[in-house]
Amino acid sequence: MSKKRKKSFPSRYILVTFVLVSGIVAWFLFAQAKSKGQIRNVLLISIDTCRADYLSCYGYKRKTTPNIDALAAEAIVFSNVISPVPITLPAHCSMLTGTIPPYHSIHNNAEFKLSESNVTLAELLKANGYATGAVISAFVLNSQFGIGQGFDTYNDKFEQVHIAGDIAERKGGQTSRIAVDWLEKHKNEKFFLFLHYYDPHDDYVPPEPFASEFADDLYAGEIAYADHCIGQVLEKLKELKLDKSTLIIITADHGEMLGEHGEDTHMYFIYQSAVKVPLIFKVPGRQKHKVINKTVGLIDIAPTVCGLLKIPSPPQIQGEDLSAFFGKSNPELRQRYLYTESLYATRYGVNSLLGVVTDGWKYIQTTRPELYDLAKDPAERTNLIEQQPQRARILQDKLKQILEQTVRKIDPQDRIELDAQAIRNLQSLGYVAGTKVSDDFEFDQTKEDPKDLIEFHNVYRRATGLVHKKQYDQVKEICKKLLADRPNFHELHDLMADIALMQKQYAQALPYLYQGLKLKPGRYKVHHNLAVALGKLGKSEESVEQFKKVIELAPNDTQTRNKIALELLRQKQVSLAITQFESSLNLDPYQPQTLNTMARIFATTSDKNLRDTKKAIELARRACELTNFKQPATLYTLSIACASAGQFQQAIENAQKALSLANTAKQNTLAMKIKKHLQSLEAVKPNLESGRSSK
């Protein structure tokens, strides 16, 4: 034994020594990498709805962005950066994939999800050993839209949201706190962190002291607040001594029109105020400020990061690696033609806006096309289409060429159908969830020009915003005026029906629902609302027929199957109701409310052929498991099921737990029901026990 120990000692000593030396060498190399300014980490910060000209480092008249300014003073600043679309989801898809909307097929918020055939920057960096994380500040970038591809952690769940839990966004301060925690956790790994700040998006309500300091320009105040929050993250990088080894990129998805050209906010037009964004690269090891005036795009971020990290870019990337600009001299590059679009106006039945931007010039294709000399006319006030037809034709040909090379057919599976909560989330952010945009890129000279509908768009958008504020009477007055102008715009009929349903005016909702379906048939949500209204009016059979149409149009909609089942229960068609509940659970077995309802049916039905106490207990227990035995309603049902099977002790114990939880949650009505149920159990149990003892 002793000889073996002596023999093993040298090898163990060598192993320990090797580990120690390896650790020292690794630390030395890491420290050396820091000192030499090599890129170890990547931090990409996107400020939603941020015009480039509102940053003080881009020349804004007031000091809005001191933290970004300090970073920019030692960074490469691009002064002419074009977003391919002034809409949050598609713009971020372009930012992370390096491709334009015709290729990645995302043209609007909440209508599409990013196909897995696309390759994101997060996927590329994860494949190269980076820890990948994202902190998202608005529902519009929720992972259900496919943009979370490649992220190890994608924080899009809002524990606290703006304005009393009613707005599907989080403030920048909370975003920064989550980011700081993430950095602390991953400080010893090489990482890619994507941060999304939503604060400059309307409504403009910056917190103090920014609200007072920028009382005359609240949009600028929101940008100043976002800068303050970004500063907290940059300070954390310094504290962790990661600032010298982290590539920091600050940009935006799009700008904001602020009333220019008649548009209140963004999404509709593609003028420079909406599509010109900041882009700043702070590269480790480089401290000299440099401004690049060349026209570049948001799609250049992904290939530039790949170029700096010596990672091959996927062949489908349409952006260009800008790292050649980061040296002492500027490279000679070919002339760029940057694509930009808004298909948003097509929802009103008018033409799209498709544009191309090159150094100093911009062409917009629509019913009345536009050409602007951006060098002399940055506000795009003078349309030169008639004065310079040859230049317009050249740019039109370039636009046609871009589309021919990039447009891909959309996979129907990548279209999104939103549930009611998702629609409310979007409305809370000021977005209109309704008609799909037209993405066929067909141009029809006979269609109206989007410019002619901007006031209609602004008013309609304000009306949908008032819905979230529950100013229903005002919404109805606006809709009636808009209907006088465009009586065949089905979304107005849908909105009038929605308001009537919210006010429980079911009879008033019916004509708008029927007219909406007449104008645009085959929409399952409208059939669903019609079914609800008919059910509330006591027209159960008609209601069920409408619900069946919903299932034909959306066969995987479990909520509709559950609602059909409830209508059948009202008609006392218990067996048919059970069939619908079962079909719903076959599609999604993780529905505690549906399991709970079925358990109650099997435990209490008067039909002896359907009564099944064993199944009732099984379903009720499953509902309790899915809610961690913390929901009083499911425990109450489990108690009822146990009692129906004669398991009175278990029934009493579950009822006691349910009562305690209901009292804690202040669910007084439910607590009273449970208390009566418990009293009846306690009254029955002694009689049963005495009956057993007499035997």
Language-model regions, residue ranges each:
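Terminal, low-structured helical/coil segments at or just beyond the last alpha-helical repeat
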Residues: 610-612, 622, 629-632, 644-648, ...
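Canonical positions in the second alpha-helix
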Residues: 481-482, 515-516, 549-550, 583-584, ...
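Structural marker of alpha-solenoid helical repeat scaffolds
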Residues: 485, 519, 553, 587, ...
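Helix-start (N-cap) detector for alpha-helical repeat units in TPR-like alpha-solenoids
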Residues: 456, 490-491, 524-525, 558-559, ...
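Catalytic domains that recognize anionic headgroups
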Residues: 2-532, 536-539, 566, 570, ...
